[in-house]
Amino acid sequence: MDQLRQSLLEAPIIEKGDYEYFVHPVSDGVPVLRPELLREIVIKIIRKVEVDNVDKIVTPAAMGIHISTAVSLMTDIPLVVIRKRQYGLEGEVSLSQQTGYAENEMYINDVRDGERVLVLDDVLSTGGTMRAVLDALDQIGAEVVDTVAVIKKAGPNELDESDHDVKTLINVRVTDGTVVIVDSNGDG
């Protein structure tokens, strides 16, 4: 993952309260997301998961959408986006998302009991978003075949004590305003 690794090493760091936050095209849409970086990420995801056993890809809005769309296009697996807007459609399930810097209500539609899903997201940091998504999918009765976050920010997160294993492409930590690569192969 040379391009992903290099782009993370070059990522600017900002502070949101006590939280050191790296600004990256995968997680923030800035700086510009180069097609070769997106292609590298998508190929790595497809190699890391068993897409043959997946009925739908599920991703939370907003920054997982571009990655999940590209994976959907390459695999012909339909995509479900978990949104921050409620529509009140039949079967809509609400979930509360809490991250290191925000709290939101989100909504999922079009996932049914027994469907096999691949959950994709951009970053696993506190685990708040992923935990809420996985809990909602459990509530629906979906079978989570695999869960992937492109980047994992090393440290404790809400999924450490859960039954869900999250595969990642690269693991980093932010130390003194700099991104440090902890594991260039990620988890799983």
Swiss-Prot record:
Q: Which GO terms describe its biological process?
A: purine ribonucleoside salvage
One annotated GO molecular function: transferase activity
- The SS bond pairs are none
Top-tier EC class: transferase
Q: Which UniProt keywords apply?
A: Purine salvage, Transferase
What are the EC numbers?
Answer: 2.4.2.-
What Pfam families is this protein classified in? Pribosyltran
What is the purpose of this protein?
A: May catalyze a purine salvage reaction, the substrate is unknown.
The similarity comment for this entry is: Belongs to the purine/pyrimidine phosphoribosyltransferase family. Archaeal HPRT subfamily.
What is the protein's name according to its record? HGPRTase-like protein 1
